[in-house]
């Protein structure tokens, strides 16, 4: 599925295995396991849900439209675009930008679509407004032959679904939105999109076994969490995902929410950023190499690219070179890794055997566990987001003026 290499995080000389062992990670481990065992947080329980038959009525539609914000949609996008980067029957409406939303609705035949309305609270402003845009268009049809599915626990959207007898799936109350990709939030639309959701859960379960290991060097979620925690304490509080697989771009968006919203509490927090190699070597690498030394880089690489071929070309000295196309980006990644390490920039590497359902299930679950461990290290609640509530109240007030 995947492997984790932390050698360069130590090689730059700012932290050592001794420093890692000085961190009270055993307490962080036991505290998180207690919360998972007692159901205080439920993101582990949901990966063992065997009842996937409930999604069987959700396929057979030409288009899949998903409406949601943040944790209600980013995990689905991360997995779908990683696994199916060249398919175009998915439409994700994840903003209140009129140009984006209305351009999608202009080209989608709703009669040939299954439409997901996803909001745990049922009151998310953007999701509510975008649902009403859909509703207006459906009401103008002579008959609606598509399907509306609501994934919500309450609020205005649940009342709408019940009033109109639409299908409703719920989300476990102990699973925050940004941890909900392995619930109906992610599994239902992914099933409609033809993704093998059983393999996603299988990958998450395999990673869960690994994350049960109390030996930190054999537990990538715990080890990566401790390494980032230590570097944060040393002033490196910007965590950059640098993916050399472009289809993982949306994983980076999911990662930004997971890290930012979970750990940005009580004056703590790591700032998550996303770079795509090799193209960002021509924009951001100068900053990473020669700018402020306040970053730790996580390289994302694949052992195998799904599309590849033999190529021949001439270099700048007219010398012929023969190689696989993928050898180019592999060499660029390795060169960047070596150069950053030589310049004292700590980095780790996650290698996915192949970009498939199992690997993505494992990857997302590893990061959920990592954030759970880091919440314990910082002694914060990684599962709420109290600071954003103020903006929501102000926004509703402005809209009603």
Swiss-Prot record:
Optimum pH is 6.3. 50% remaining activity is observed at pH 5.3 and pH 7. The active site is at residues 261, 282, 392. Its main location: cytoplasm. GO terms for cellular component: cytosol. GO terms for biological process: gluconeogenesis; glucose 6-phosphate metabolic process; glycolytic process. Keywords: Cytoplasm, Gluconeogenesis, Glycolysis, Isomerase. Its EC number is 5.3.1.9. Competively inhibited by 6-phosphogluconate and erythrose 4-phosphate. Optimum temperature is 89 degrees Celsius. It does not lose activity upon incubation at 80 degrees Celsius for about 120 minutes and still has a half-life at 95 degrees Celsius of 40 minutes. At 100 degrees Celsius, an almost complete loss of activity is observed after 30 min. CDD domains: SIS_PGI_1, SIS_PGI_2. GO terms for molecular function: carbohydrate derivative binding; glucose-6-phosphate isomerase activity; monosaccharide binding. Pathway: Carbohydrate biosynthesis; gluconeogenesis; Carbohydrate degradation; glycolysis; D-glyceraldehyde 3-phosphate and glycerone phosphate from D-glucose: step 2/4. Gene3D superfamilies: Glucose-6-phosphate isomerase like protein, domain 1 (3.40.50.10490). It is found in: Cytoplasm. Pfam families: PGI. It comes from the Archaea. SUPFAM superfamilies: SIS domain. It catalyses: alpha-D-glucose 6-phosphate = beta-D-fructose 6-phosphate. Homodimer. Catalyzes the isomerization of glucose-6-P to fructose-6-P. Belongs to the GPI family. This is Glucose-6-phosphate isomerase. It comes from Methanocaldococcus jannaschii (strain ATCC 43067 / DSM 2661 / JAL-1 / JCM 10045 / NBRC 100440). The lineage of its organism: Archaea, Methanobacteriati, Methanobacteriota, Methanomada group, Methanococci. The gene is pgi.
């Amino acid at each position: 599925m995947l492997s984790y290499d932390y050698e360069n995080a130590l090689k730059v000389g700012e932290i050592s295995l001794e420093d890692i062992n000085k961190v009270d990670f055993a307490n962080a481990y036991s505290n998180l396991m207690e919360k998972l065992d007692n159901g205080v947080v439920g993101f582990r329980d949901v990966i063992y849900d065997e009842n996937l038959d409930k999604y069987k009525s959700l396929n057979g539609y030409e288009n899949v439209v998903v409406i949601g914000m943040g944790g209600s949609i980013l995990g689905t996008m991360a997995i779908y675009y990683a696994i199916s980067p060249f398919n175009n029957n998915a439409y994700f409406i994840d903003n209140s930008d009129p140009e984006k939303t209305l351009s999608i609705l202009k080209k989608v035949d709703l009669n040939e679509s299954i439409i997901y309305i996803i909001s745990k609270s049922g009151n998310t402003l953007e999701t509510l407004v975008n649902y009403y845009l859909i509703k207006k268009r459906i009401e103008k049809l002579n008959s609606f032959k598509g399907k509306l599915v609501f994934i919500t626990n309450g609020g205005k959207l649940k009342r709408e679904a019940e009033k109109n007898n639409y299908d409703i799936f719920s989300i476990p109350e102990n699973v925050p939105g940004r941890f909900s990709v392995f619930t109906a939030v992610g599994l239902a639309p992914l099933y409609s999109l033809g993704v093998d959701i059983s393999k996603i859960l299988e990958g998450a379960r395999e990673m869960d076994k690994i994350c049960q290991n109390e030996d930190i060097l054999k537990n990538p979620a715990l080890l990566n969490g401790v390494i980032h925690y230590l570097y944060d304490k040393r002033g490196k509080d910007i965590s950059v995902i640098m993916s050399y697989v472009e289809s993982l771009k949306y994983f980076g968006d999911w990662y930004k929410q997971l890290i930012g919203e979970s750990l940005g509490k009580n004056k703590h927090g790591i700032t998550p950023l996303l770079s795509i190699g090799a193209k960002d070597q021509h924009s951001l690498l100068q900053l990473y190499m020669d700018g402020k030394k306040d970053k730790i880089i996580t390289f994302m690489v694949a052992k195998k690219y799904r599309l590849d071929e033999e190529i021949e070309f001439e270099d700048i000295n007219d010398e012929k070179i023969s190689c696989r196309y993928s050898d180019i980006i592999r060499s660029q990644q390795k060169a960047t890794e070596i150069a950053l390490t030589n310049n004292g920039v700590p980095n780790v590497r996650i290698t996915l055997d192949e970009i498939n359902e199992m690997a993505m299930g494992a990857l997302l679950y590893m990061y959920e566990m990592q954030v759970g461990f880091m919440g314990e290290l910082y002694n914060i609640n990684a599962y709420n987001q109290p600071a954003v509530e103020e903006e929501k109240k102000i926004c509703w007030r402005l809209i009603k003026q």
